[in-house]
């Protein structure tokens, strides 16, 4: 008997039978070994055949196990296992049956027929479980679909639809699909295209996350509920699993063979199956090698002849990139465009999905949370689509609440740690016998008893609250199951079961749920089980860094005192500080225009008066770190071609994939302070880019992505008109100086640019008293640096006056002060520390002697 006459699956089963006999110390491979190997085989071709014939496979497998146990064992055979004579007879019978059926190869199911013809114990057992030659022969015809076995891999390609597709209608019947709310027009249009005589293949196109797959799931649910035209009733919607189709296709032509078997089975179904191909663009080029066809080209004939009812889904970009390039494939599909739903539609979708998420997370989702998820995600997450981004917020907020319920509350956790700490101390003191230790031990025991009693009470409260929450969830699960049972009964036309559920079980469960919910509504001390708009805002703030959660009292207080905080570092510029503070307060109070940046300012003034320092202070105030500021030195953008660095290089240029300097920074941190330093030094074309940012709060980068600037503070600094400020500072008031400066500024910048800036702020030159305040601030920073090293610095008033006097320059502002502190304070201090004249842990005083500052200890 030639082994190459068997199919590959049958050959693997024979090898498995040999291993089985060897492992059980059997001298011969009997037919029962092969039958067990065929049943236990991964992707067994025998199992579906027996299931079709209503055979209890588990019972058959246990009977075969008993037969194996009765076979004689031979020890010391040394791995020499041979085919038994009955096995040889069966193989000859298999060959005879295969020839009778005109098969080129002997397949696994032929072995079943041969075993039934044989009079051995295996044949007897198969007859006992209800198999006959006629029944098996008919089942083989059905499974093969009238085809002969002319390929060693024929068994692997059988039942291709079961292996390589997922039945969406079956999942809809089982209630495993989420409800599809809205989208009626798109589903109706899809049905309309499917009803056509030719080109009845819709392709659903839309941005990622708008619900393309949900439309097909909605179609499957309508088919199950008989809410479709006569022509589509009873059809199955199968989703092609491209992963399963490609996985394990090692040899050339294997992928094509699998796809061909899927198409052949679909052709046999004669239009009763609608094939859904998610990510349709993956079919173009899939399986393409040198000179071979890709999957897209294999689909074309079936699509053209109408043998294949296909629904595709892909994004707009991928449709353009892959499908439109292949005009022959594109013309066989009919486009169904899916737009992003509105905020109102998203709220309706979320209300429909609410129960599923409540059941999964075992928490309650409130209606304000649903409205907040839709509106906040629409406003603050600009790079993704509704309803996907809103569903994500609901899901994550519910997950965070569930995490808090499942994990130990913070108060309990702290108590437990304290108790452990006290027990360790108790153990240490119990070994000491002096009077002080015994007194401490007595006090410790009292404290420990108190803490343990407190812990026990809190734990009881926690367990009670958890039990109350789990009770409602159990009822909700039962109610969901009862509703699904009622849906099954409605489809089956079982009126008795329907009335029993509708008027008995469901109202009873709803009543129980109401009672449990009322008990749950009592104020909980440790646990929260409701997702509110606050939780949604918290999740959004974590995702984007934008503070949208309700302000705590501390933050409100901080915002009201914002000017005082900024004045701690920025001296003498009250107008600028007031303008910036008001913009931030408007934003956090929710009053600013949602379609523009939080604020856009042009700071004008001479060098060293605090323009850049105010930006750093603002970033530090808003984000507790100066690093949160996106600082762009505009003197780097003096050439025309350097403008592309801000938004990214255009296609075809080096660096296209990297993105823009400004756009990438804002995409990563949508809530930030953007400082465009020395803006007048930039090329005029840069201001054309800024027009869109200042007016609409958006900018399109080199790759066509829209970047959202609506949550940024844009600050531009410039030295324009500083000479006019110096000339007129003594004679004119603030408004007079501002009009003089604007005269210079309007000649340099275009009107459309200046018109879009919220506020143009002119900074004053700094006077002697301002320099003294700044000197005090800078010496405080020096004192902090010295404190880290162990030195305590004290500055006398005379020393402070001298530093302010030396560092004062009306033209250069506060910058000379830094040099004055370096030369007059830091240099002598450094020498004294290195010489050992100043030692740590003692006060260091700065005093003035003969117009010189000396460090004295």
UniProtKB/Swiss-Prot annotation:
The protein's name: Chaperone protein ClpB
Limits of the Clp R domain: 3-146
Q: Where in the cell is it found?
A: Cytoplasm
Its gene? clpB
Residues of the region (C-terminal) are 766-857
Segments carrying the region annotation (Repeat 1) are: 6-71
Q: Which GO terms describe its biological process?
A: cellular response to heat; protein refolding
Gene Ontology cellular component terms for the protein in this record: cytoplasm
Function (record text): Part of a stress-induced multi-chaperone system, it is involved in the recovery of the cell from heat-induced damage, in cooperation with DnaK, DnaJ and GrpE. Acts before DnaK, in the processing of protein aggregates. Protein binding stimulates the ATPase activity; ATP hydrolysis unfolds the denatured protein aggregates, which probably helps expose new hydrophobic binding sites on the surface of ClpB-bound aggregates, contributing to the solubilization and refolding of denatured protein aggregates by DnaK.
Ranges for region Repeat 2:
83-146
What coarse category fits the chief subcellular location reported for this protein? cytoplasm
Record family assignment: Belongs to the ClpA/ClpB family.
List the keywords (alphabetical): ATP-binding, Chaperone, Coiled coil, Cytoplasm, Nucleotide-binding, Repeat, Stress response
Tell me yes or no: is Disulfide bond among this UniProt entry's keywords. no
Q: Which Pfam families match?
A: AAA (PF00004), AAA_2 (PF07724), AAA_lid_9 (PF17871), Clp_N (PF02861), ClpB_D2-small (PF10431)
* Linker as annotated region, ranges: 341-545
């Amino acid at each position: 008997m030639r082994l190459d006459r068997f199919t590959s699956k049958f050959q693997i089963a024979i090898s498995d039978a040999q291993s089985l006999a060897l492992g059980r110390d059997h001298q011969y491979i009997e037919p029962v070994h092969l039958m067990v190997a065929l049943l236990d085989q991964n992707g067994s071709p025998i199992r579906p055949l027996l299931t079709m014939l209503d055979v209890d496979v588990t019972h058959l497998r246990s009977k075969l196990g008993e037969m194996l146990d009765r076979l004689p064992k031979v020890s010391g055979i040394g791995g020499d296992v041979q085919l038994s004579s009955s096995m040889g007879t069966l193989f000859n019978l298999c060959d005879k049956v295969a020839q009778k059926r005109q098969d080129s190869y002997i397949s696994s199911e032929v072995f079943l027929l041969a075993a039934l013809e044989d009079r051995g114990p295996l044949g007897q057992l198969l007859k006992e479980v209800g198999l006959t030659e006629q029944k098996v022969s008919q089942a083989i015809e059905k499974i093969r679909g009238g085809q002969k076995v002319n390929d060693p891999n024929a068994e692997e390609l059988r039942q291709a639809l079961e292996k390589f597709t997922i039945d969406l209608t079956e999942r809809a019947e089982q209630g495993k699909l989420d409800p599809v709310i809205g989208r009626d027009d798109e589903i109706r249009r899809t049905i309309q295209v499917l009803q056509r005589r030719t080109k009845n293949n819709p392709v659903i196109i839309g941005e990622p996350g708008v619900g393309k797959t949900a439309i097909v799931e909605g179609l499957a649910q309508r088919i199950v509920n008989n809410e479709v035209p006569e022509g589509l009733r009873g059809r199955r919607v199968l989703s092609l699993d491209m992963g399963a189709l490609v996985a394990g296709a090692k040899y050339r032509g294997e992928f094509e063979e699998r796809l061909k078997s899927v198409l052949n089975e679909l052709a046999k179904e004669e239009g009763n199956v609608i094939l859904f191909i998610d990510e349709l663009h993956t079919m173009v080029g899939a399986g393409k090698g040198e000179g071979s066809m890709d999957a897209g080209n294999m689909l074309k004939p079936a699509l053209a002849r109408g043998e294949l009812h296909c629904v595709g889904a892909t994004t707009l970009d991928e449709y353009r990139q892959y499908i439109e390039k292949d005009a022959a494939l594109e013309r066989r599909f009919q486009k169904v465009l899916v737009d992003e739903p509105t905020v109102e539609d998203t709220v309706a979708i979320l209300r429909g999905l609410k129960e599923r998420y409540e059941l999964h997370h075992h928490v309650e989702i409130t209606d304000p949370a649903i409205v907040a998820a839709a509106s906040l995600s629409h406003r603050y997450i600009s790079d993704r689509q509704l309803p996907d981004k809103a569903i994500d917020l609901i899901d994550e907020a519910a997950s965070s609440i569930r995490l808090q319920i499942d994990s130990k509350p913070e108060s309990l956790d702290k108590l437990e740690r304290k108790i452990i700490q006290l027990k360790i101390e108790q153990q240490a003191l119990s070994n000491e016998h002096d009077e002080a230790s015994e007194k401490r031990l007595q006090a410790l025991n009292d404290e420990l008893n108190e803490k343990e009693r407190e812990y026990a009470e809190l734990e009881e409260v926690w367990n009670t609250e958890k039990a109350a929450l789990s009770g409602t969830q159990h009822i909700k699960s039962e109610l969901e199951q009862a509703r699904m049972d009622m849906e099954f009964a409605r489809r089956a036309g079982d009126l008795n079961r329907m009335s029993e559920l509708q008027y008995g079980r469901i109202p009873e469960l709803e009543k129980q749920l109401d009672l449990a919910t009322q008990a749950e509504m009592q104020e909980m001390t440790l646990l929260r089980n409701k997702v509110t708009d606050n939780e949604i805002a918290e999740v959004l703030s974590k995702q984007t860094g934008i503070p949208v959660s309700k302000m705590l009292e501390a933050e409100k207080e901080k915002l009201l005192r914002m000017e005082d905080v900024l004045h701690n570092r920025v001296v003498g510029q009250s107008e600028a500080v007031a303008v910036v503070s008001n913009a931030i307060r408007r934003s956090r109070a929710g009053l600013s225009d949602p379609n523009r940046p939080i604020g856009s300012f042009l700071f004008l003034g001479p060098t060293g008066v605090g323009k850049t320092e105010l930006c750093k202070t603002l970033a530090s105030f808003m984000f507790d770190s100066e690093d949160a500021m996106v600082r762009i030195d505009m003197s780097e953008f003096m050439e025309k071609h350097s403008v592309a660095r801000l938004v990214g290089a255009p296609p075809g240029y080096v660096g296209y994939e990297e993105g823009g300097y400004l756009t990438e920074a804002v995409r990563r941190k949508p809530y930030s302070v953007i400082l465009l330093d020395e803006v007048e030094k930039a090329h005029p074309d840069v201001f054309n880019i800024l027009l869109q940012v200042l007016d609409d709060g958006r900018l399109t980068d080199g790759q066509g992505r829209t970047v959202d600037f609506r949550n940024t503070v844009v600050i531009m600094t410039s030295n324009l008109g500083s000479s006019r400020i110096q000339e007129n500072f003594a004679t004119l008031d603030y408004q007079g100086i501002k009009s003089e400066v604007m005269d210079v500024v309007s000649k340099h910048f275009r009107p459309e640019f200046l018109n879009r800036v919220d506020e143009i702020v002119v900074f004053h030159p700094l006077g002697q008293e301002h320099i003294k305040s700044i000197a005090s601030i800078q010496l405080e920073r020096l004192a902090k640096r010295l404190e880290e090293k162990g030195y305590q610095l004290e500055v006398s008033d005379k020393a402070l006056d001298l530093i302010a006097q030396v560092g004062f320059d009306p033209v250069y502002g506060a910058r000379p002060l830094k040099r004055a502190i370096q030369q007059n304070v830091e240099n002598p201090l450094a020498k004294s520390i290195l010489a050992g004249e100043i030692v740590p842990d003692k006060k260091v005083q700065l005093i003035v002697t003969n117009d010189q500052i000396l460090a004295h200890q």
